[in-house]
Amino acid sequence: MENNDELMPREKLLAFGAKALSDYELLAIFLRTGIKDCPVMSLSKNVLTHFGSLHALLSADKKAFCSVKGLGITQFIQLQAITEMTKRYLKQEMLSTPIINDLETVKLFLLTELQHEEREVFMVLFLDNQHRLIKKERLFLGTINVSAVYPREIIKEALYCNAAALILAHNHPSGITEPSYSDQLITKKIQDAAELMEIRVLDHLIVGKSDCYSFAENCLL
């Protein structure tokens, strides 16, 4: 039974692609084997039930991760390595492709960067005149409101790296991506300051636990 349970997700992936698999099936492939009296598929479901979600599992620190029966330091190290490789892959994709042509890659990148943060983080992507990434910068931490975000600091950094365009981003630790009035006001202030220097604000993305809200897609820019 163990072998059948282990092979089923792999066969499904080969036949239909990784997107066809559930969270626990993907985790089962990662875990590879179960433990005594607990086949890998059951172990995978137990692990996800314990953490509550794939997001919580990936966010767990070493102590919390290794405290779960069937998980250990080896799996923790492997999962951290996979997560970091994903971040680097997405960054390299953004460096080689005009960002404006691939908003989904930007969203995935920002999710890997910000979805696990317990505090609000305001990040800016600085782009060249072909909308390729020059650099990313975390500029403000804590409660993100009009008094905590300084447009002049953003414009100063943009001029320093000769950026022609910006993508703004910040996370909502609550997971709710709907923009507040304060979010809209901050965006307008930055946009006005950028226009004075002939720098475009292409989008402002609010990052939740599993998705992003785009100001541009919702006609708020």
UniProtKB/Swiss-Prot annotation:
UniProt lists the family membership as follows:
Belongs to the UPF0758 family.
What sections of the protein cross the membrane?
none
Q: Where is this motif: JAMM motif?
A: 170-183
Residues binding Zn(2+), per UniProt = H170, H172, D183
By its UniProt entry, which NCBIfam families does this protein fall under? PRK00024.1, radc
User: What is this protein's name?
Assistant: UPF0758 protein NTHI1125
Q: Does the keyword Cell inner membrane apply?
A: no
Cite the entry's keywords alphabetically: Hydrolase, Metal-binding, Metalloprotease, Protease, Zinc
What Gene3D superfamilies does the record tag this protein with? Cytidine Deaminase, domain 2
Tell me the GO molecular function terms.
metal ion binding; metallopeptidase activity
Q: Which Pfam families match?
A: RadC, UPF0758_N
Q: Name one GO biological process term.
A: proteolysis
Q: Which organism is it from?
A: Haemophilus influenzae (strain 86-028NP)
Give the top-rank taxon of the lineage listed in the UniProt record for this protein: Bacteria
Q: Where is the MPN domain?
A: 98-221
Q: Which residues form a coiled coil?
A: none
Q: What InterPro entries does this protein's entry cite?
A: MPN, RadC_JAB, RuvA_2-like, UPF0758, UPF0758_CS, UPF0758_N
